[in-house]
Amino acid sequence: MRILYCASEANPFCGSGGLADVAGSLPHTLCRKGQDCRIVVPLYGTIPQELRNSLNFITNFTVPVAWRHQYCGLFWARWHDCTYYFIDNEYYFCLLY
């Protein structure tokens, strides 16, 4: 089965609560059971630099939003046998809290 797991946060890349714990562990369990599970999360500014260094650039494009066009970058990384995709947009995701 092919599964695309989308979440606002996933450990170890970004997380502040229970959702990050589930999104960081459930897909890995599915991968270990032979499923093709991939995870999509925002590329937050709070992701540690050592993890950011493991990201691979795929492409970038613009997305029409009302009267303007917003940049969107797409990156990927492998972590514990799962593929993560990261959506980059500093306007929305550069949260340095």
Residues covered by each model-derived region:
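Conserved small/polar residues in nucleotide/adenosyl-binding loops
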Residues: 97
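N-terminal subdomain of nucleotide-sugar transferases
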Residues: 1-75
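Beta-strand-turn-beta hairpins that frame and shape the catalytic cleft
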Residues: 76-85
